[in-house]
Amino acid sequence: MTHPVITAARFNEAGLIPAIAQQHDTGEVLMMAWMNAESIAESLSTGQVCYFSRSRGKLWRKGESSGHVQRLVEMRLDCDGDTLLLLVEQTGPACHTGAHNCFFRRVTKDGLEEIA
Amino acid sequence: MTHPVITAARFNEAGLIPAIAQQHDTGEVLMMAWMNAESIAESLSTGQVCYFSRSRGKLWRKGESSGHVQRLVEMRLDCDGDTLLLLVEQTGPACHTGAHNCFFRRVTKDGLEEIA
């Protein structure tokens, strides 16, 4: 049976919806990636976050190779159904660069600077 | 002069980039909307967040009619340049429904439930 969140979600033309991952207990915004109906269903059934990789064109089980998995604590759908918020428990760094989150470039008056 | 964040940003085919708004002092994720080069430049110069409304096809100065403005505290660009994180000071509710943030629908085992 299709979970109601998949019915309510407004996917884009590629069948994808943006998903924001946030560390559930600290509020740290970790990353934003994309999900399709299949990856939402898998995330809900396994409790481990699974995205859809646009570059590889296939499911992306977060941490499958790195071990940097995300346990799904809670999933939320926004008011108009076109964005998901995933409250997660992140193991290790979330970013493929090794940074704890992906938002480590701060915009300054005239440039970008890396923050820890 | 074009700000380096606009040069570094990877806009989609419609010239847009997703932007996550987060209350800077509480970590509450408020909403996700879209920005283009022009709205990024205006946000940086005025210090008030300006998005691009896809449905109306024009700049959307957040709170222009409702007064629910977002003062831009800090802007960050993610590791691969395709998502922005906006740390903001939100005045009033962020969501057009009047909810404080847009993520008020929690996914349950078999449905969606509204949370305060």
Curated annotation (Swiss-Prot), chains A, B:
Coiled coil: none annotated. It comes from the Bacteria. Zn(2+) binds at residues 79, 95, 102. Its cofactor is Mg(2+); Zn(2+). One of its GO terms (biological process) is L-histidine biosynthetic process. Its EC number is 3.5.4.19. Keywords: Amino-acid biosynthesis, Cytoplasm, Histidine biosynthesis, Hydrolase, Magnesium, Metal-binding, Zinc. SUPFAM superfamilies: HisI-like (SSF141734). It catalyses: 1-(5-phospho-beta-D-ribosyl)-5'-AMP + H2O = 1-(5-phospho-beta-D-ribosyl)-5-[(5-phospho-beta-D-ribosylamino)methylideneamino]imidazole-4-carboxamide. Its main location: cytoplasm. Mg(2+) binds at residues 78, 80, 82. GO terms for molecular function: magnesium ion binding; phosphoribosyl-AMP cyclohydrolase activity; zinc ion binding. InterPro entries: PRA-CH (IPR026660), PRib_AMP_CycHydrolase_dom (IPR002496), PRib_AMP_CycHydrolase_sf (IPR038019). It is found in: Cytoplasm. Homodimer. NCBIfam families: PRK00051.1 (NF000768). Belongs to the PRA-CH family. HAMAP family: HisI. Catalyzes the hydrolysis of the adenine ring of phosphoribosyl-AMP. This is Phosphoribosyl-AMP cyclohydrolase. It comes from Acidiphilium cryptum (strain JF-5). The gene is hisI.
